[in-house]
Amino acid sequence: MSEVEKKEEETTTTTTVEKTEEKKEETSSFAPAAEIKEYAADVEPNVEYEATLKRDVVEVKTNEENEDTLFEIRAKLYRFDTDPSPQWKERGTGNVRFLEDKDSKRIRVVMRRDKTLKVCLNHHISPALSLGEMTGSDKSWVWKCPKDFSDEEKPEGVEELFAIRFATPENAGLFKTEFQKCQAKNEAIEKKTE
């Protein structure tokens, strides 16, 4: 390589280094800390928001307003489905409650699904109902209901076979005790009305 070529190469590298340093200086957007503190002290944030759409308050009715909760416990509900092949199908998970009407004093059992709050169990606790043990589990009970009103498509009620499962055998025992107490109360009310 000749001396001329070496000098040209050196000048090109120096000019490129100088240009990149200039670009770095131009693109640097950091301000000194003192300037930032001054600016921050002068600025007051405006965080007031107003709703763009005004809505009316809607009263939600659950048809449980005229009832007192006597008992409530978490459980998983199943119903026996015979079509197309006989099997237990999950109806929902949530809190099962015994509700007493303030006027008539009749007690019904109601269960709503957790997230949707859709009713998955709704019938009166009749003295004719028989709560039986589910085979192979000490945490579950089975009973046949002549008319369950939880299905919106069949408001006249439908006959169902239910199974309910609890987290512990103690909870299952509590449920059975309360169920039988409610049956006795409803039986006494039915005898008074006859």
Curated annotation (Swiss-Prot):
An annotated Gene Ontology molecular function: small GTPase binding
Gene Ontology cellular-component annotations: cytoplasm; lipid droplet; nuclear pore; pathogen-containing vacuole; phagocytic vesicle
Disulfides per UniProt: none
Matches recorded under Pfam families: Ran_BP1
RanBD1 domain sequence ranges: 42-188
UniProt feature, compositional bias: Basic and acidic residues: 1-10, 18-27
Superkingdom in the source lineage: Eukaryota
CDD domains from the UniProt entry: RanBD_RanBP1 (cd13179)
InterPro entries (alphabetical): PH-like_dom_sf, Ran_bind_dom, RanBP1-like, RanBP1_RanBD, WH1/EVH1_dom
Region (Disordered): 1-36
One of the GO BP terms on file: nucleocytoplasmic transport
Annotated SUPFAM superfamilies: PH domain-like
Similarity comment text for this entry: Belongs to the RANBP1 family.
PANTHER family, per database record: E3 SUMO-PROTEIN LIGASE RANBP2, RAN BINDING PROTEIN
Name of the molecule in the record: Ran-specific GTPase-activating protein homolog
Originating species: Dictyostelium discoideum
Lineage summary: Eukaryota, Amoebozoa, Evosea, Eumycetozoa, Dictyostelia
Gene, per the UniProt record: ranbp1
